[in-house]
Structures are given as C-alpha cells and as structure tokens.
C-alpha cells in the first residue's frame, strides 16, 4: 500500500495533525467555533491592513487625508477600510465569546493555553488601541493623549515613561509614526503566539461541555468540525459583509470624522466600544494610579481564575449556583460597557463604582465560594 503523503511529509504532517486527523471530542458545541473564527478574523485583518498600509501615510499632516484618499480614490478602498474597521469589532466579539466559553466550561484549567490566551488578549487590545490612533481624527488624538498619559501615574518613572512613548512633550508626529510601526508589527506577534496557543491546546486536547475526559469518545476533526467551522466562517463573513456594506459607521465615533485638533477637546473622550468596560473600571476610581492598576487587574484577573477554581467539577454545566454568578458577571460586563460610554456625572458614577466592585467580587469571592458550597451540598469533598 502506498504511503499517505499527508501523514509522512514533514510539513503536511503538521497540518494533518492540526486540521484533519486531530482527535476531537464528539460533543463540543457551537461555543467551540470561536477559536477558528478568531483565526479567520486575524487573517482578514492582516490582509486588509496590508492593503491599507500600501496607501496610508504615517504623518500628522497627511494621515487624515490619506485615509480620505483611500476611501475616495483607491479601487475598493472604502470597502477595505470598512472591512478592517468592522473586522476589529468582530474580532473582539469573538474573543469575548471565546473567553466566556473558557470561563463557563472550565477550559482555564489548561493553564499554559489559558495564560497565553490572556497575553493574546493584551496584545490584541494594544494593537486595536494603536490602530485607532492612525486615522488622526479628534478621538484618535485625544484617546491617545488620555490613555498614554495614564502612565504618568506610576511613581518616579511615570513622566519619563510618557515622554518616551510620545517621543516628545506631547502626542505628535513621532507618536503617530511609532504607533503605525507597532500596529504593523503586533499582528505578526499575535500570529506567532496563536500558533503556540494551539500547540499547547493540542498537548492536552480540547475540553468539552461536560468537562469530563473524552478520550474514549473522539472523532476526527475533518470532516465533522471542518464543516462545522465552515458554517461559522460563513456566518461571520455574512455579518461582516452586512456591517461593512450597510452599517459601516454603526460602531464608530462621529467625532473621528473631524481632523485632530490639539486646541479643541471633544465633549466626551471615550474609546471604541470594546474597551468601554475597562474604561468604566478605570474611571470608577477617583485616584489616578488606583484607576490604572484597576484597569490592568481587570484583565490580569483572568490569570488568577485557574487558581481560584474550588469546585470538584470542571464545567458549570451541572452547577446552577455558578451559572447564576457567571450570568451575573456577563450582565455586569454589559453594564460596565454602557457606563463607559456615559458622561462622568451622577447617577453614572455610582453605577460604575458598584459595577466595578461587583466585577472583582464575582471573580475573587462569589465564584470560588459557589464552587466550594456546591462541593458541600453534593458531598464531593
């Protein structure tokens, strides 16, 4: 019998073990689609970003005009820009669903995979932030000024750190140039880390909705999950098409259609919608350094989750109390997102502070206590 080339060729063998003959649990649901959707989002963003970079000029006197030029004069430039801008939003939708799936089904117990995932989230947020500055509109400029200025809260080194990032004494040409360099570079770093993320996942195999060992019931990735992923791809592409073609500015900020003016501050400085929850946590603390640390810990807390797991069961499927707290956390995130887009006045300040305390309390107190109590009532200890 002739040897199968996909199982013997050094390169094809890797592809085969990752995408074709990979043993996958037979009961993984649609929530396991988001990993591959994130891969698709990354490819879309790199391809559209590359074409945008061919026509973009990273100079404060030309950046805004070059984006206008892309939309008006470049063949399908408007479409490429709309796909890139809305693709970023869908990227965050997918990553938040992906993280929520991991929290609900206990996937965080694969510690290496989970921690690399958290680093990937940080890198994605950094990429989106520096990318938002590039069109050099009002919100680009003032968003960059406000967020980078937060680093000045760190004692002793703060002011030097801010000037080092700015490349001067204010957000200026040097800042835009380096942000463009970072925005071009970081997606490739994300790609490398994504490969390591998948590598670590395949050391253990996928988790499943029941949180049980599925070694006795595995099926091959192709054709079962390759077709299932293809359906997910189609859904995502339709959604992206609808957004880019019919509602391209739905998730954007109208203020960013005004060229950056250092002399005029916008009435409400706020980031893109996918950062609003973290921005609300930042604003809920009156102290500058405290706010910055809360902002950092709002993401870093995900790294603590594996160590706060007290339940004898992995998944939340059969744990009603944990489910209640999980959905409370989801609702809390939505409230924080809403508050992040509101002006700093009552009652929004108080709601934001309550939601911020709830956010950390759910992770650090409620969920570990729920796991411990469920062990007690089920006599699992």
From Swiss-Prot:
Heme b b562 binds at residues 84, 183. Its cofactor is heme b. One of its GO terms (molecular function) is metal ion binding. It is found in: Mitochondrion inner membrane. Belongs to the cytochrome b family. PANTHER family: CYTOCHROME B. This is Cytochrome b. The lineage of its organism: Eukaryota, Metazoa, Chordata, Craniata, Vertebrata.
């Amino acid at each position: 019998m002739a040897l199968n080339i996909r199982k013997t060729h050094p390169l094809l063998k890797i592809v085969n073990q990752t995408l074709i003959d990979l043993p996958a649990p037979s009961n993984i649901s649609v929530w396991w689609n988001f990993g591959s959707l994130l891969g698709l989002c990354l490819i879309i963003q790199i391809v559209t970003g590359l074409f945008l970079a061919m026509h973009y000029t990273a100079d404060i006197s030309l950046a805004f005009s070059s984006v206008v030029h892309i939309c008006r004069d470049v063949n399908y430039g408007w479409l490429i820009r709309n796909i890139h801008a809305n693709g970023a939003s869908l990227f965050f939708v997918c990553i938040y669903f992906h993280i929520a799936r991991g929290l609900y089904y206990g996937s965080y117990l694969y510690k290496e995979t989970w921690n690399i995932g958290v680093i990937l989230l940080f890198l994605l947020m950094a990429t989106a932030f520096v990318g938002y500055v590039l069109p050099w509109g009002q919100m680009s400029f003032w968003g960059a000024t406000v967020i980078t200025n937060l680093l000045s809260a760190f004692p002793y080194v703060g002011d030097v750190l801010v000037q080092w990032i700015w490349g001067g004494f204010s957000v200026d040409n040097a800042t835009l140039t380096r942000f463009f360099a970072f925005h071009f570079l970081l997606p490739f770093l994300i790609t490398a880390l994504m490969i390591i993320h998948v590598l670590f996942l395949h050391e253990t195999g996928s988790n499943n909705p029941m949180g049980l060992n599925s070694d006795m019931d595995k099926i091959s990735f192709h054709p079962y999950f390759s077709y299932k992923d293809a359906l997910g791809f189609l859904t995502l592409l339709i959604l992206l098409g609808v957004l880019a073609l019919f509602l391209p500015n739905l998730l954007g900020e109208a203020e960013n259609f005004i060229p950056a003016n250092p002399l005029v501050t916008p009435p409400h400085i706020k980031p893109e919608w996918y950062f609003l929850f973290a921005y609300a946590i930042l604003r809920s603390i009156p102290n500058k350094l405290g706010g910055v640390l809360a902002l950092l810990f709002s993401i870093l807390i995900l790294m603590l989750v594996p160590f706060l797991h007290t339940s004898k069961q992995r998944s939340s499927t059969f744990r009603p109390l944990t489910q209640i707290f999980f959905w409370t956390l989801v609702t809390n995130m939505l409230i924080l997102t809403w508050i992040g887009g509101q002006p700093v006045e009552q009652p929004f300040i108080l709601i934001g502070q309550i939601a911020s305390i709830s956010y950390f309390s759910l992770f650090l107190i409620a969920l570990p206590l729920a796991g411990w109590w469920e062990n007690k009532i089920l006599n699992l200890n």
